[in-house]
């Protein structure tokens, strides 16, 4: 992270994500305190943390549950039987993720399952545990929403250029994984904003339009 942040802004990656399983961190209070301190430092520099507790497998599990339910797995080993019940012979390896057909078809390529996992993840993150309660969550949806905001901006710019028959000088200004403002000459034209799973386009005059973030925009869309 430090190496990337030391680069000049024009040479730096568009976004820096840190994807982390927190099960081993939380076990050690001293280690977790150091992590929290570093997290606050890097968040101020624009790094987006993608935490999962206990581990990334809770994200995979959300793809395959029939309905949302809060769970309290403390470690990967505790969660493992649940993930193996829906993904037999599951392995926490790059080879498995790349080669296993069941994983590919139900996790990587299944749009309906992905939208369900996003919904369940947001519900899990909204829950506030009581003191010392173990609760599971994943923030992988933040990365998906971030890239979907960028995709929608790219579509807006392309469609405007096509409609006006000239290049359009607009720029994105990203506040977080939830919000992207479409800018022209430092003025906001409109803002793309997530509220839960819903994406809206809000214009400065107050007009608001719903956007389906799973489908490309086209010329028939009201915001164009």
Please identify what each model-predicted range represents:
Residues 2-17, 22-161, 174:
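C-terminal accessory helical subdomains adjacent to catalytic cores in phosphodiester-
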Residues 81, 89, 110, 161-162, ...:
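Generic detector of low-complexity/intrinsically disordered segments
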Residues 115, 137, 153, 165-167, ...:
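Low-complexity, intrinsically disordered short peptide segments enriched in small/polar/basic residues
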Residues 153-164, 206-224:
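Mixed-charge, Lys/Arg-enriched low-complexity segments
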Residues 155, 169, 173, 187-188, ...:
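Generic short N-terminal amphipathic or hydrophobic helices
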Residues 165-198:
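Amphipathic, interaction-prone secondary-structure segments
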Residues 188-218:
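Intrinsically disordered, low-complexity regulatory segments enriched in Ser/Thr/Pro
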